[in-house]
C-alpha cells in the first residue's frame, strides 16, 4: 500500500481516476500560471515560485519527510523549449461515440496507400475520446456561441447562427472580434433559457483541425461532381490530424462517407544520418542550392527514387549518387537520338520483318511497361525510377546497345538490319520518355522536342501524350525468350574469358578475338539452343565456333564457364584482315582495300 499524489486538474490520468470516485475537480492555477485564491497564502505566486516556499513551510511544520531533486522525462513546449504543466479548463467537445461505427465503416470505401493506413485509422477512431474542438488563442475561427449575462448559460440557436453567418458573408469572421454581441445577434433576440436580453461572446476559437477538416465541404460543395476528393496526401502524423478530422466532419456533421477516395501518406525528409532537419542543427538543405548545383530534375529524381512511405534521407552524397543514374538515362537517350537522325517514325519495320534481337529488346520493354504501370497505379514512384534505371543499364547499355552498334554504324543506311534496330530504338525511347516524364519533367520534354514523332503524337509536349502500352505484335514467346536467356549466360562466360585474354595481352579488343565453345553435360543443351544464332555478332567477336572435340587450341586462352558448368571457352587472336570500316577480322577481305564483304557491298551501293 502507499499514498499517491492525485491532482485531477493537472493530469489526464488523475482526472479520470478522481472522476470515477466523484472527487472535486480542483484547479488552483489560473491562465497566467499563478495560484488562485483557492491556494490561500500562495495565491498570486507562479507555480515555480511557490515550490520552494511550500517546501519551506512543510519542513517548518514537520510535515516534510524528505526532499530530493531527480532527473526524469518531463514535457516541454515544442516552440520555446520551457517546461509546461497540464491544466484542466472548460472546453467545447464533440462527442464521437454516436458515429464511431459510421466513421470506421467509411474507411472501408477508401483506398489506403500504404494499405495498413486503413487499420491505423480505424483503431485511432475506435480508441479516441471526445474531440476537444475549442482553443484559447487570439487568432482563428471564433466559436459562434454566446453566454447569457443573466443565467450564464451558453446560447447557440439556428437563429443566432444564421445571423452570424450573414455578417460573415460580407465582413468575414473578423466581425466576431470587431462587433459587440448585440450587433451580431438579431434585433430583439432573447435567451431561450431565461428570456435575458444581454449577452457575452465566446472567446475561444475553433480547433484548427476542425477548420481544416471542413475544407472538403468548402472546396467542393459548390461543384457536387467533385465531392469526394480523388486523393488526400499528407505526412504520417495526419492520421491523427487532417485525415481523421476530415473524416469525422464528413460523417458526423454532414452524414456522408469519407471525403476522399484515396488516402496516401508519406514519411519525413531527414538528413543523411536519419536526423530530423532543424535550423538549430544546421542540417537542412536549400532546394535553390540543389537546383543550381544539380538542376531541378535531379531534385525531382530524388523524390521519385525514394520510398516515401518511410522517412526519406536527403544529403549531398545522395544527390551525387543519383546524378549517376540521371546521366545514365540521359546518355541512353542521347545514344538513341543520335541513331534516329532522319528516321521516319511513321514507317516502322513490320513485326514479321524485325530481327529477333530487336524483338528481344521490345519484349523486355513490354515487361518494363507492365511493371511500371503497376507501380504507378500504386504510387510507387521509386519502383518506376529503379525499373527504368535497371533497364537502361542491364538490358540496354550492357547488352542490346552494345551489340547493335555494328548494324547502326556499318550496315546500309536504309537496310532492313539498320531500320529494324532504329524501329526498336524509337519505340524504346518513345516509351521511356513518356514513362519517365512525370518524374523527369524537364529532361523528358527536352528529349521529346528533339526526337521524331508519329502522326498520332502531340509533338508540343511529352505530357500531352498517353504512355505506351506493351507492343504485343513485336513480342517473342516464352520459348524464344528462354533461348535468349541461354545466350546471355553464355555471353557472360565468354566475356570473362575475353577479359582474361586481354589481361594476358593475347588480344586487344574483343573484335580481335576468335572464340571456340565446347560443352559437356547440361551445357550441351544450352549450346543447342543458340547454335542457329549469329554468335559472332551477339558476342561482338570476329569469329565464334562450336566444337565437338575436347581438345582446346594450344595457343588459346581457355577457361571453364562460371554461369554454365561444363562449358569451356577458348579465345585466340582472329585470323584474317581487320576491316578498316567495321574492325571485324575477315578471311575474305578485299586484297586492295581490306574491306570485309559486308562493308564493300554497303559502300558500293552508296556510291
Residues of each region from the PLM?
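Residue patterns forming the tRNA-binding/recognition surfaces of aminoacyl-tRNA synthetases
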Residues: 2-161, 174-181, 242, 275, ...
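Alpha-helical recognition segments enriched in aromatics with Gly/Pro capping
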Residues: 21-33, 137-139, 161-311
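Residues immediately within or flanking Cys/His clusters that coordinate Zn2+
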Residues: 74, 91, 143-145, 188, ...
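Short cysteine-rich clusters marking metal-coordination/redox-active sites
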Residues: 77, 148, 191-194, 579, ...
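Short functional micro-motifs and their immediate structural scaffolds
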Residues: 85, 156, 198-200, 584-590, ...
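Cys/His-coordinated zinc-binding microdomains
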Residues: 136, 152, 195, 583-586, ...
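Acidic, turn-prone loop/beta-hairpin segments
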Residues: 199, 343-373, 401-497, 501-521, ...
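C-terminal accessory/binding modules appended to enzymatic or scaffolding proteins
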Residues: 561-590, 595, 599-600
Amino acid at each position: 500500500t502507499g499514498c499517491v499524489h492525485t491532482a485531477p486538474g493537472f493530469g489526464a490520468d488523475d482526472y479520470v481516476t478522481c472522476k470515477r470516485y466523484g472527487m472535486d475537480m480542483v484547479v488552483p492555477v489560473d491562465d497566467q500560471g499563478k495560484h488562485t485564491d483557492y491556494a490561500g497564502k500562495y495565491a498570486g505566486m507562479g507555480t515555480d515560485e511557490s515550490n520552494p516556499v511550500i517546501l519551506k513551510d512543510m519542513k517548518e511544520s514537520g510535515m516534510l519527510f524528505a526532499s530530493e531533486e531527480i532527473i526524469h522525462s518531463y514535457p516541454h513546449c515544442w516552440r520555446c523549449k520551457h517546461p509546461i504543466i497540464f491544466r484542466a479548463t472548460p472546453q467545447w467537445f464533440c462527442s464521437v461515440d454516436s458515429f464511431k461505427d459510421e466513421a470506421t465503416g467509411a474507411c472501408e470505401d477508401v483506398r489506403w496507400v500504404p494499405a495498413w493506413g486503413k487499420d491505423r485509422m480505424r483503431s485511432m477512431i475506435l480508441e479516441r475520446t471526445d474531440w476537444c474542438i475549442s482553443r484559447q488563442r487570439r487568432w482563428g475561427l471564433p466559436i459562434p456561441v454566446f453566454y447569457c449575462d443573466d443565467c450564464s448559460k451558453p446560447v447557440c440557436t439556428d437563429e443566432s447562427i444564421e445571423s452570424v453567418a450573414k455578417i460573415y458573408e460580407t465582413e468575414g469572421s473578423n466581425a466576431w472580434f470587431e462587433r459587440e454581441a448585440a450587433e451580431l445577434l438579431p434585433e430583439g433576440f432573447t435567451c431561450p433559457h431565461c428570456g435575458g436580453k444581454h449577452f457575452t461572446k465566446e472567446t475561444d476559437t475553433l480547433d484548427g483541425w476542425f477548420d481544416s477538416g471542413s475544407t472538403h465541404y468548402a472546396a467542393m460543395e459548390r461543384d457536387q461532381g467533385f465531392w469526394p476528393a480523388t486523393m488526400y496526401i499528407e505526412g504520417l502524423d495526419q492520421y491523427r490530424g487532417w485525415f481523421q478530422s476530415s473524416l469525422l466532419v464528413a460523417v458526423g456533421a454532414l452524414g456522408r462517407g469519407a471525403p476522399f477516395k484515396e488516402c496516401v501518406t508519406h514519411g519525413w525528409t531527414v538528413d543523411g544520418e536519419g536526423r530530423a532537419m532543424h535550423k538549430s542543427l544546421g542540417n537542412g538543405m536549400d532546394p535553390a542550392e540543389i537546383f543550381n548545383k544539380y538542376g531541378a530534375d535531379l531534385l525531382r529524381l530524388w523524390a521519385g527514387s525514394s520510398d516515401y512511405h518511410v522517412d526519406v534521407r536527403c544529403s549531398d552524397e545522395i544527390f551525387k549518387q543519383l546524378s549517376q543514374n540521371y546521366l545514365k538515362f540521359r546518355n541512353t537517350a542521347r545514344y538513341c537520338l543520335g541513331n534516329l537522325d532522319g528516321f521516319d517514325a511513321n514507317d516502322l519495320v513490320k513485326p514479321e520483318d524485325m530481327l529477333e534481337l530487336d524483338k528481344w529488346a521490345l519484349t523486355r520493354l513490354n515487361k518494363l511497361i507492365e511493371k511500371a504501370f503497376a507501380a504507378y497505379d500504386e504510387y510507387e514512384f521509386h519502383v518506376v525510377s529503379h525499373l527504368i534505371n535497371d533497364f537502361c543499364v542491364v538490358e540496354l547499355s550492357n547488352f542490346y546497345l552494345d551489340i547493335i552498334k555494328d548494324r547502326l554504324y556499318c550496315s546500309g543506311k536504309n537496310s532492313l538490319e539498320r531500320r529494324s534496330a532504329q524501329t526498336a530504338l524509337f519505340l524504346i525511347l518513345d516509351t521511356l520518355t513518356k514513362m519517365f516524364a512525370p518524374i523527369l519533367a524537364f529532361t523528358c520534354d527536352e528529349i521529346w522536342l528533339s526526337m521524331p514523332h508519329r502522326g498520332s503524337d502531340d509533338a508540343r509536349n511529352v505530357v500531352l501524350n498517353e504512355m505506351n502500352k506493351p507492343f504485343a505484335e513485336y513480342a517473342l514467346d516464352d520459348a524464344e525468350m528462354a533461348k535468349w536467356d541461354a545466350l546471355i549466360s553464355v555471353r557472360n562466360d565468354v566475356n570473362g574469358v575475353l577479359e582474361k585474354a586481354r589481361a594476358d595481352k593475347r588480344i586487344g579488343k574483343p573484335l580481335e578475338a576468335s572464340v571456340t565453345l565446347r560443352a559437356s553435360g547440361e551445357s550441351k543443351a544450352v549450346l543447342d539452343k543458340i547454335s542457329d544464332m549469329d554468335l559472332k555478332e551477339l558476342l561482338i567477336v570476329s569469329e565464334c565456333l562450336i566444337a565437338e572435340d575436347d581438345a582446346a587450341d594450344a595457343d588459346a586462352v581457355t577457361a571453364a564457364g562460371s554461369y554454365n558448368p561444363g562449358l569451356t571457352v577458348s579465345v585466340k587472336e582472329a585470323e584474317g584482315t581487320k576491316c578498316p570500316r567495321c574492325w571485324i577480322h575477315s578471311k575474305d577481305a578485299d586484297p586492295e582495300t581490306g574491306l570485309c564483304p559486308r562493308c564493300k557491298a554497303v559502300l558500293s551501293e552508296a556510291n
